[in-house]
Amino acid sequence: MSVECSGELFFYPPFTTMSKELISVHNPNPEPVIFKVKTTAPKHYCVRPNSGKIEPKSTVNVQVLLQAMKEEPAPDFKCRDKFLIQSMAIGDADTSNVENYHEFWTEMEKQGRSIFDRKIRCVYSTKQPPQSADKQVENTSTSNPPVSVEGSENLASSVGGPTAVGVSLDEAQNDFNGAKDHLSNGVNTVVPDSTFRSTFESAQIPDASVVQTVVTDADNGAASVKDTIVTAESASSKGADVARSKVQDIIDNEIPKPSESPRRSVSSTPPVHPPPPVPQNLSAVNEEFDTKKNDFDSKLPESTPAVEKVSENLGSETRESLQGAKPAAGAHSSDNALEQIKPSYSADPSSSTGASLTESPGIPPNIVIILCLIFFLIGYLFF
């Protein structure tokens, strides 16, 4: 119960665009079969239909779409992609309500029916398809409706080629070329002129007035459609203007405006601070400074002996005062001298509240006065 199909599927350039090829699956068996298609590269191919039913002695065309590649493959590239067509005989099973043949396949497989496989190898060809010219003629002819030619039977009988009444343009052209060759070779059977005349007169060409009428009707329809579009655009623009004016009125009337506070004027010129006063006569200041300096230098030698004399007197008086503080007799011990220097406190406990510290003898007042005078003179003369 296997199906019949070609063992190779050829794809032709260009591969940067989507390629479409057909697989003809034929059922030579006396009973119907179901099939499904599998591939080793599901991301590269799209199969329509990928499952279905084939009646006895019938053929189903399976469309295979190859996704576009980023660049053309190398000339020596070998494609390893494959397709697998599985078939299964279903006998008298009812498939009138079957929508998904994959589920129906699963049900039949559970019944233990035999499965037959047919493998198809993909081939990327570097040459153009051999029937590309035929396909181009076919695409050109299918764009125009078939023309019914009267007297084609007579033409066919005269040249020995069977032709249908509703012959297409390409078949009529082939028959005409065959008749021409046949006549040029000296065949005695000559087609009468009336036959050719009736043949070409049957292809009625529409009158120019009819064509003009059709063109006029088309122009009128286009003009009416254009007027409708213009009317709709004008209506929409008017509606937009009305809505815009209403929104502006709401903004002007209902939204409160912020209170405007007076702004202080800010001067653009920066403030100018007056420079410090500069003495007008610098020479007078310099002369005054030089005069004071000369006076100080002249007084300094005169005051130096007096300062030395005062310092000598101060030193002698200081030594005498320190010597007078010592005991007259040298026989006193250091302990007695320390006891004299230490402060004495009253021994009477009753007078402890009124007791006072007895101070040791210090620097005499006259020495303090002399020291103050010396420091005053030094500060006056040198500072």
UniProtKB/Swiss-Prot annotation:
UniProt keyword terms in alphabetical order: Endoplasmic reticulum, Membrane, Phosphoprotein, Transmembrane, Transmembrane helix
PROSITE patterns listed in its UniProt record: MSP
Basic and acidic residues bias spans: 241-263, 289-300
Matches recorded under Gene3D superfamilies: Immunoglobulins (2.60.40.10)
Keyword Heme assigned: no
Modified residue annotations for Phosphoserine: 236-237, 259, 261, 268
Recorded phenotype for the gene knockout or disruption: Leads to the dissociation of the cortical endoplasmic reticulum (ER) from the cell periphery and its accumulation in the cytoplasm, in particular in the vicinity of cell tips; when scs22 is also deleted. Affects contractile ring assembly, contractile ring anchoring and displays severe cytokinetic defects; when scs22 is also deleted.
GO terms for cellular component: cortical endoplasmic reticulum; cortical endoplasmic reticulum membrane; endoplasmic reticulum; endoplasmic reticulum membrane; endoplasmic reticulum-plasma membrane contact site; plasma membrane
Gene Ontology terms: biological process: endoplasmic reticulum membrane organization; endoplasmic reticulum-plasma membrane tethering; establishment or maintenance of cell polarity; maintenance of ER location; negative regulation of 1-phosphatidyl-1D-myo-inositol 4,5-bisphosphate biosynthetic process; plasma membrane organization; reticulophagy
Stretches the record annotates as Disordered: 127-160, 233-359
Disulfide bonds: none
UniProt-recorded Gene Ontology molecular function terms: endoplasmic reticulum-autophagosome adaptor activity; endoplasmic reticulum-plasma membrane adaptor activity; phosphatidylinositol binding; phosphatidylserine binding; protein-membrane adaptor activity
Cytoplasmic side: 1-362
Ranges of Polar residues composition bias in the record: 127-146, 347-359
Compartments in which it is found: Endoplasmic reticulum membrane
Transmembrane segments: 363-383
Record membrane topology: Single-pass type IV membrane protein
Record domain MSP: where: 1-123
Subunit organization: Interacts (via MSP domain) with duc1 (via FFAT-motif); the interaction is direct and serves to restrict the localization of duc1 to areas of cell membrane-endoplasmic reticulum contact sites, and away from the cell division site. Interacts with epr1.
Family: Belongs to the VAMP-associated protein (VAP) (TC 9.B.17) family.
Free-text comment about domains: The MSP domain is required for binding to the FFAT motif of target proteins.
Entry function: Vesicle-associated membrane protein-associated protein (VAP) implicated in maintaining the cortical endoplasmic reticulum (ER)-plasma membrane (PM) attachment. ER-PM contacts function to modulate the distribution of contractile ring components to ensure robust ring assembly. ER-PM contacts function also in controlling exocytosis and maintenance of cell polarity regulating cell shape. VAPs play an important role in regulating eisosome assembly. VAPs also contribute to ER-phagy by tethering atg8 to the ER membrane, but also by maintaining the ER-plasma membrane contact.
Annotated protein name in UniProt: Vesicle-associated membrane protein-associated protein scs2
